[in-house]
């Protein structure tokens, strides 16, 4: 889908709605895993998910950052109309994907070091070790899926993956229920189900691309890829990866602080995070749309469309954030019972609901989701990294000041502080770039 011409409401909706729907279904994976674990296993298993969330955030954010960057480069290549440029960009991205998969396998072998880094409580480590090993070893399946997804997004094709995400949710549900509910497996089975589901989606995406978009899979030999392409991908993906890594580092610092609290509170955070991630998913995909649209218009040399589309994305962002906040405050107890189960102790569900009600208040104003993607597509890599540094600093303040003084509520206030501060800085940086007409490279 081409966003370099005049604004078309129908085309915009056809691109955006499937994109948000697909991400919602993707996030249902984590919610289902949490719900099944909460229903079928004890609070210790739920605490393992919560305690490991900081480490898994690092893995997930590094992968997401690289592939967001790859998607921007692919979108810029598509916008340029240069077939050879598109082929060499995809080829380089494919080779980077293989390297990232290998790094995930290596990280899985060092699981004891990972648990030390994450400050995993000793009583949780026997169950946490296989859970982390499977999660990191499955990075290759996640990477293959993400590469094919951003390749489709670069040409504006979001419909198929939206439908495929429904199948993925069903497959993940069946596997989790089978492994944990029927076969009585441990918490590691939740990670295994997610890895298998991602592998299935990657295979189906590859089949679709071979049928409908075979030209997108054209590759070039390693020697035929210019050094500038390697560097542009590394710079683009690396900037977002560094940003995401800094955000994940902040999450890890915050999680280390939370892991000093009672196991029931660690479990409460796991419940709250599963709902928070699902609720903010549509807004996250507005950020993806910002990257795709900005990247295409940078490639086409049409900067005016960037502002036109960005204004529309901002309005949608506020509306979705207010809707999520209203949902949590009005029917939050019912949502919590649905995920945790009616028999879950209020020592877990009560703090989880309070945490969610505090953090959701910042949803309508978390504009950094939009700004960081637009800045990256405009080649403002320093600004992207600066946003990440700010979030780490805010998380450190939370872990070292707010949590020791306010307990579990301090961790929720830390999220509000981090997201709010990065939104303010992101707005300043974006307006400066657009007002100054800073040049950007495709």
PLM segments and residue spans:
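Helix-loop interface residues and adjacent transmembrane-helix termini in multi-pass membrane transporters
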Residues: 31, 40-43, 77-80, 154-155, ...
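Non-cytoplasmic
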Residues: 31-34, 333-334, 379
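Alpha-helical transmembrane segments of multipass membrane proteins
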Residues: 31-35, 113, 147-151, 173-178, ...
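Short alpha-helical transmembrane segments in multi-pass integral membrane proteins
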Residues: 1-16, 74-140, 174, 180-238, ...
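Transmembrane helix-bundle signature of multi-pass secondary active exporters and lipid flippases
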Residues: 19-72, 135-142, 231, 237-296, ...
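Short runs within selected transmembrane alpha-helices of multi-pass transporters and secretion channels
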Residues: 67, 134-153, 161-172, 190-205, ...
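Small-residue-rich hydrophobic transmembrane alpha-helices
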Residues: 46-105, 109, 142-161, 268-327, ...
């Amino acid at each position: 889908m081409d966003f370099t011409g005049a604004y078309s409401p129908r085309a915009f909706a056809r691109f955006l709605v499937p994109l948000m729907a697909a991400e919602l279904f993707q996030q249902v994976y984590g919610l289902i895993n949490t719900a099944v674990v909460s229903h079928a296993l004890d609070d210790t298993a739920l605490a393992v998910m919560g305690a490991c969330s900081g480490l898994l955030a690092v893995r997930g954010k590094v992968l997401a950052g690289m592939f967001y960057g790859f998607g921007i480069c692919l979108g810029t290549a598509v916008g340029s109309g240069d077939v050879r440029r598109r082929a060499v960009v995809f080829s380089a991205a494919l080779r980077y994907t293989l390297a990232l998969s290998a790094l995930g396998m290596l990280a899985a072998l060092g699981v004891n070091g990972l648990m030390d880094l994450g400050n995993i409580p000793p009583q949780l480590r026997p169950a946490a070790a296989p859970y982390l090993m499977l999660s990191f070893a499955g990075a290759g399946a996640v990477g293959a899926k993400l590469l094919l997804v951003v390749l489709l997004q670069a040409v504006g094709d979001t419909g198929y993956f939206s439908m495929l995400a429904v199948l993925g949710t069903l497959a993940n549900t069946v596997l989790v229920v089978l492994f944990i509910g029927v076969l009585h497996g441990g918490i590691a089975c939740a990670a295994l189900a997610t890895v298998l589901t991602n592998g299935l989606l990657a295979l189906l995406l590859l089949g679709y691309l071979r049928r409908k978009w075979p030209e997108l899979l054209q590759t070039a030999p390693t020697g035929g890829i210019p050094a500038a392409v390697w560097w542009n991908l590394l710079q683009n993906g690396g900037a977002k990866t560094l940003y995401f890594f800094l955000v994940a580092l902040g999450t890890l610092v915050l999680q280390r602080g939370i892991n000093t609290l009672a196991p029931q509170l660690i479990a409460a955070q796991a419940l709250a995070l599963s709902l928070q991630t699902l609720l903010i998913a549509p807004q996250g995909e507005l950020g993806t749309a910002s990257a795709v649209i900005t990247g295409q218009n940078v490639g086409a040399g049409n900067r005016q469309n960037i502002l036109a589309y960005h204004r529309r994305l901002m309005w949608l962002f506020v509306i979705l954030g207010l809707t999520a906040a209203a949902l949590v405050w009005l029917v939050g107890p019912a949502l919590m019972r649905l995920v945790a189960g009616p028999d879950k102790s209020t020592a877990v569900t009560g703090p989880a609901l309070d945490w969610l009600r505090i953090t959701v208040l910042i949803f309508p104003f978390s504009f950094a989701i939009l700004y960081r993607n637009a800045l990256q597509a405009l080649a403002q890599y320093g600004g992207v990294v600066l946003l990440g540094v700010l979030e780490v600093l805010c998380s450190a303040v939370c872990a070292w000041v707010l949590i020791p003084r306010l307990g579990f509520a301090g961790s929720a206030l830390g999220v509000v502080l981090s997201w709010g501060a990065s939104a303010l800085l992101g707005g300043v940086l974006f307006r400066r770039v657009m007002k100054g007409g800073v040049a950007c490279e495709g």
